[in-house]
Amino acid sequence: MNVVPILLLILDGYGLAPDSTGNAAKLAFTPNIDRMLAMSGGTQIHASGRAVGLPDGYMGNSEVGHLNIGAGRVVYQQMTRIDVAIENKELDSNPILLDLFTKVKSSNGRLHLLGLLSNGGVHSHIRHLEALLSIAKEHNIQVILHPFMDGRDTGPKDGLKFMKEIVSFLTSTSSGVIGSFCGRFYAMDRDKRWERIKLAWDAIVHGVGLHVEDSVKALEQAYASGETDEFIKPRVMGNSSVNCVQDNDAVLFFNFRADRARELVSAFILPDFNGFDRGRVPHLSGIATMTMYDKEFNIPVLFNHENITKTLGEVVSALGLLQLRIAETEKYAHVTYFFSGGREEVFTGEERILVQSPRDVATYDLKPEMSVMEVTDRLLTAWNSKKFSLIVCNLANPDMVGHTGNIKASISALEAVDNCVGRIEKAVAEQHGCFILTADHGNVEEMLDKSGQPQTAHSCNPVPLIAIYDGKPLNLKESGKLGDIAPTILSIWDVSIPNEMTGNNLLSSE
């Protein structure tokens, strides 16, 4: 073990992209960062899409970025986790799903699938629903679908194409029928507006609502009368309540995001529920949810929360070394909670420094330097104490000012950051330590869209990874990802990489 002190500096929202009028990173005068980017040995790493556990083409973000960096592996987000389980057929043998099928068969009941009909990828995805329908069909399960129309994470009338798709799928595969449908305004409230949930409940359980024969035509008629997806009033298929949730039936909620599914689930399972008068409450043979909605529910979950162990922070602590996490308020949770794999408690030997972000401005383009000077001052004091083997620091400016869409202010932010980067690099070299410069995702390098309009969102661009040890750049391999940083740090120390840390060591022997 050769534990040289390492300072990991994360420039939040600093991606790499070609020169353009919207690339504030190229427009700014940043001699220190530019010099490091030009060094031989540095590399670009992926910070978006599947490389960080998100769906292909999805931009990275600070939470996911720090989670991957700290975990030293690809941490699949819920949607991608389910996608992967479908691709490798793990969903087909999911024990909770199979147990639900068993309960349905033993009770001679039906399985009701409830969730958002959408490809928005925020609460659900239609491909997850279609996979569930296919698997249920293979097990000869009678399925009744109660879709909720989106209109928030998709266009206000995009629901028609999703309804056509799912009707076509149900028809071609003979995998089920639609029992009712309504807008998410009713079925997915999260503010205890129980009068909305009651309308969805009454349609799903009691068959109360506007009765229709054709879901596609009914949706078209709703549009014609001024309703849009989010606000589609509950419709019940057919003239009776035969396809409503009955005794001995089972229910599966297929949303993977919890917050807007909890209220309707609670109406099904809580004996002391008092949100509204439920009327007849069906005695279910089983109920399950795609992910953990609430620990208090105590019901089966197809994809439980992953317990991320052997993170970089945990390994450093187990080695008996001291570590420091430091950031200003806007990014403090990222270098602590997310970097530690979703752990709030400090590790033994871990210290934290929180620097207050400016409160005297409404938006950070009015103060683009934010608190970077104080963060740097306190960081250098800690570094020069020679107390810590690992310091993790986040500089928030590129991301937070980039989000304002103000290119001029973003240039000022980057120039303030560059000054601090130069100071930090010099201090690390003086202590013969290792300085690692990277970012969690892109933003400030792509501030205009293709039409020249302001773009305030993150990007899918790669980010830099530069390691300078004792004043000299280390040679790093290409085609890495954020999850490779932690294994690389352990390799610099010549420490064995735990099996849980499945990222790659990017140190090159060349």
Curated annotation (Swiss-Prot):
Protein name: 2,3-bisphosphoglycerate-independent phosphoglycerate mutase
Cofactor mode of binding and number, as noted: Binds 2 manganese ions per subunit.
Keywords: Glycolysis, Isomerase, Manganese, Metal-binding
Amino-acid positions noted as binding Mn(2+) 2 in the UniProt annotation, renumbered to this chain: 12, 62, 440-441
Lineage of the organism: Bacteria, Pseudomonadati, Thermodesulfobacteriota, Desulfovibrionia, Desulfovibrionales
Cofactor(s) this protein requires: Mn(2+)
Matching Pfam families: iPGM_N, Metalloenzyme
PANTHER family: 2,3-BISPHOSPHOGLYCERATE-INDEPENDENT PHOSPHOGLYCERATE MUTASE (PTHR31637:SF0)
